[in-house]
């Protein structure tokens, strides 16, 4: 028995020597230098309840030590593989200590010269926390491997991930465009393509499938946005195509041959639109209600001969008044960004919950900016 206890003590001592966050001597003669870290967290601002911001050096053969310093915490993480995994408990304590301030990060590393180098930067920590769940669609990268996909949620203060819906249960059909009403996890929608095709509205334990028709013919809905009241949902209806270039650096081209915006009345189970949102002379898409519910922001481009003139398509950012009591729109459209004048194209507009900030993507042309370098 004594022998066994001795082995346990020796093993425990060895583990303590490798323990991240334990005292680690820092190189005294490190020279200031740049290094590309992934992900790049330099000077970012994060919510106080975010999970550890683990990162790595560009070469897994690089040795390094990372120091995280706040007023009351001093964490040191050694690595022989270029990967820095920050202990959960120590990160939480450091983030709590740095609320409204910053964590000073010092990354010591050895490059090809085998000399110690040093990169310093701050990570700012907000006094505020964010919603506890992040929801996203997970699919293989590329443009063909869509047979396995799902909508997942991850707890932001750790790395626990759970499926909301996985397409293994639906015959490997496409699921996409999930959207929540005012970040309410119990009230959401998502689209299902092919098998069991349609748009599904989830309200607590109730699930309804909706199908919008035009002159008796069902058509698919795409980009959604809830009205803050929960009574309406704005959708785009897109005839989307995908082509491939032989020599262009943007190898894949995704474009709309037509698109309009329709509004679905949740309580009355009906869809409606107006000419300013569904003109055959324009491509209307990416609707987004403002937080007060009194305006709809959307993108619109002049229709052209597609796909031949795809590079001529540039989307304006527009706004139209909306009366949620009557369910009616205004008679004119305001231009927030004139694509014809600016020479760029707008997509995916979003208004901050307080209504003070507007976020959107800008690209040289088109509306599928993720493929445009």
Listing of model-derived features with the role each one plays in the protein:
Residues 187-188, 230-233, 293-296, 358:
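Hydrophobic beta-strand positions that form the internal "hydrophobic ladder"
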Residues 18-21:
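C-terminal motif of bacterial Sec signal peptides marking the signal peptidase cleavage site
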């Amino acid at each position: 028995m004594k022998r066994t206890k001795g082995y346990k003590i020796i093993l425990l001592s060895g583990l303590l020597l490798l323990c991240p966050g334990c005292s680690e001597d820092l190189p005294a003669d490190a020279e200031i230098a740049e290094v590309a870290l992934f992900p790049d967290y330099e000077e970012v601002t994060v919510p106080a309840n975010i999970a550890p911001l683990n990162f790595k050096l560009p070469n897994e053969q690089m040795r390094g030590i990372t120091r995280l310093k706040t007023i009351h915490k001093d964490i040191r993480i050694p690595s022989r593989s270029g990967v820095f995994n920050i202990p959960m408990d120590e990160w939480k304590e450091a983030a709590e200590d740095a609320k409204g301030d910053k964590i000073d990060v010092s990354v010591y590393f050895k490059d090809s010269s085998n000399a110690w180098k040093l990169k310093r930067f701050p990570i700012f920590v907000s006094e505020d926390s964010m919603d506890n769940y992040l929801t996203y669609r997970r699919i293989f990268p590329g443009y063909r491997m869509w047979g396995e996909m799902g909508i997942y949620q991850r707890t932001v203060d750790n790395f626990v991930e759970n499926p909301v819906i996985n397409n293994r249960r639906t015959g490997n059909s496409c699921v996409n465009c999930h959207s929540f009403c005012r970040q309410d996890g119990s009230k959401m929608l998502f689209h299902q393509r092919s098998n069991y095709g349609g748009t599904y509205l989830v309200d607590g334990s109730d699930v309804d499938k909706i199908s919008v028709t035009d002159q008796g013919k069902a058509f698919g809905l795409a980009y959604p946005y809830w009205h803050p009241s929960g009574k309406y949902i704005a959708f785009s209806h897109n005839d989307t195509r995908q082509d491939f270039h032989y020599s262009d650096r943007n190898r894949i081209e995704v474009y709309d041959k037509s698109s309009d915006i329709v509004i679905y009345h949740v309580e009355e189970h009906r869809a409606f639109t107006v000419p300013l949102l569904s003109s055959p002379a324009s491509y209307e898409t990416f609707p987004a209600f403002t937080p007060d519910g009194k305006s709809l922001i959307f993108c619109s481009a002049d229709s052209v001969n597609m796909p031949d003139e795809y590079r001529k398509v540039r989307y304006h950012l527009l706004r139209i008044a909306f009366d949620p009591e009557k369910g009616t729109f205004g008679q004119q459209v305001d231009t927030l960004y004139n694509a014809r004048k600016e020479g760029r194209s707008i997509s995916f507009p979003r208004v901050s919950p307080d209504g003070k900030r507007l976020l959107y993507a800008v690209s040289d042309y088109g509306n599928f900016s993720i493929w445009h370098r």
